[in-house]
């Protein structure tokens, strides 16, 4: 069956004839939604146009072109021993220190109780003995 399939690859001129037929000496446009513009030469795909067997649909096949290994460049990786920039561990440590400092700078329990007009006991953490043994089930 695959051998019986016919591939209709057409030239640009034939496609333009189908898109813009001439009727009574005037140019007549068949489809208003479709446009075709040639791709630049350095674009990473090859374009093939075809027409379906009923002649009503133009099909565009554009697979990406494989780039040979000789044309690629390696990603530059700095030497971690002699690199003066921050290492990953240093960045994580500074972020952790920032979070700890941020928690210490927050308002104290007395300030919170004054701001929200509550007692100071509301802002202390509850122990395990006050944990709800029958929490509501998630829906």
UniProtKB/Swiss-Prot annotation:
UniProt entry tagged with the keyword Secreted: no
Keyword Ribosomal protein assigned to the entry: answer is: yes
Q: Name one GO cellular component term.
A: mitochondrial large ribosomal subunit
Q: Where is the transit peptide?
A: 1-32
The UniProt keyword set, sorted, is: Mitochondrion, Ribonucleoprotein, Ribosomal protein, Transit peptide
Q: Where in the cell is it found?
A: Mitochondrion
Q: Provide the family line.
A: Belongs to the mitochondrion-specific ribosomal protein mL42 family.
Q: How does it assemble?
A: Component of the mitochondrial ribosome large subunit (39S) which comprises a 16S rRNA and about 50 distinct proteins. Component of the mitochondrial ribosome small subunit (28S) which comprises a 12S rRNA and about 30 distinct proteins.
User: Would you tell me the protein name for this molecule?
Assistant: Large ribosomal subunit protein mL42
């Amino acid at each position: 069956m695959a051998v019986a399939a016919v591939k209709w690859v057409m030239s640009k001129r034939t496609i333009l004839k189908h898109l813009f037929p001439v009727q009574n000496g005037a140019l007549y446009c068949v489809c208003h939604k479709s446009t075709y513009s040639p791709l630049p030469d350095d674009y990473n795909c090859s374009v093939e146009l075809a027409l379906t067997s009923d002649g009503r649909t133009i099909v565009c096949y554009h697979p990406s072109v494989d780039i040979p290994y000789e044309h690629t460049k390696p990603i530059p990786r700095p030497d971690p021993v002699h690199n003066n920039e921050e290492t990953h561990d240093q960045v994580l440590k500074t972020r952790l220190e920032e979070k700890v400092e941020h928690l210490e700078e927050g308002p104290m329990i007395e300030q919170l109780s004054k701001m929200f007009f509550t007692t100071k006991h509301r802002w202390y953490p509850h122990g395990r003995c006050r944990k709800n043994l029958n929490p509501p089930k998630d829906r």
